[in-house]
Amino acid sequence: MNYTCTRDNSTSISASKAILAGISPDGGLFLPEEFPKVSLDDIAKMRSMTYPERAAYIIGLFLTDFTNDELKAYTAAAYSKSRFGEIPAPVVDIGGESILELFHGPTSAFKDFALQLLPYLLTASAKKQGINDKIAILVATSGDTGKAALEGFADVDGTGICVFYPYGGTSEIQRLQMTTQQGKNVLVTAVKGNFDDAQSGVKAIFTDKAYTDELKGMGIRLSSANSINWGRLVPQVAYYFSAYCDMANAGAVKFGDEINIAVPTGNFGNILAAYIAKLCGLPVKRFICASNKNNVLTDFIQSGTYDKNRPFYLTTSPSMDILISSNLERLLYLLSGRNDAEVRGYMAALAKDGKYTVSPGLHRAIAAEFACGFADDARAAETIRRTFEERRYLADPHTAVAIAVYEEYKLSTGDCTPAVIASTASPFKFSRSVLKALGKDTSGCEFDLIDRLADISGLAIPSRLAGLRDMAERFTGCIEPAGMKSFISKGLIK
């Protein structure tokens, strides 16, 4: 299976080349030239598999230049009991809906599913391509991706990783997870501005041909651990198939019937992975795209106009504080009939004017698949409180946004299709916001709050979050976006 580019249909490269590159030189994103088909019989066979086996099966359909034995070894290591516990992606019934818990990995966020596996895929891809260069991983993060990438790539031979996060734009626990990171090959800095500034800076570096050529001359290749990299996205497709199997096994859905999937959405990668699962054969009726107050996606799905020219809000769900949703480009490409010229036009308009309006036909195609809505901090807090009091389920602010938007969708449409809601982070990463939502005391340091939340909820504190209290901060700097390239050159290139 080869991969093409959202901005150039003449591109045709292998999976390993796409993973190594991360992003096309023209700024476009890679997608399979065609999607593999997964029949109901195939899904039925997955019902008795372990999570690593399910993941290896689905990922193997996309990464055809990897052997089945290779992928089984990688998923067994990446999703081991020591990293994810007994059940990496459990589905929990909260009374009417199913919650897909994606926060049981080493950094307590859904990004672990991709970023524990990506180092294996990336280093193997380099070997398959006969490349011995050092691979420099660049990451822009709104909170969770940075730590998950650092955890995955720390001290991996032949790699270095540099993470940029928005100053003041993460939770305190998210910040500490990054600034205390151990490893000889890791580098972290805050960037003045918001996530979009950091992400735009990283994209600009990738498409700076003079700079990337200079690095290649020094034996260094840039790659990405953001979801613009196909190697980040494909592991996420697997957990939606796994969720369906677990729902069927638990009787939450009759096998073969459709489900709805609700996802808290910022950069559009997680919900796009769910849509790709449907394209492959997963029985899905509707996708519910849930935004916070930065509701650019809600407005787009409703109107057909994407406009980032709006106020940027810092919310209690910081991983969704995004106004430029990079993975939306992949959806535009797919639903426009793989019209690369049309996508180039939209992306050029976004770069020039900060907005674009899709064709009526494309807008209808998007609206047919995706419902949408948003919940501000007050609604998210009320949902946290009510969900805990009525269902005894403790949700983090991102998950609460998805629950609130899904409940609104169900009420307004009467659609009672069995649903799964993606829970993307542990509530302990956002203890202050969760405690405030519950009407509890929020005085004291972050670790006092974590302890208090554990006492109230009866839940165990993730061990790696608890361990942060004894770790010293290594990375305390903050730079201007214009200084990102210089920071990389001074720090990673030695």
Where are the model-predicted features located?
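PLP-dependent amino-acid enzyme catalytic core
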Residues: 1-494
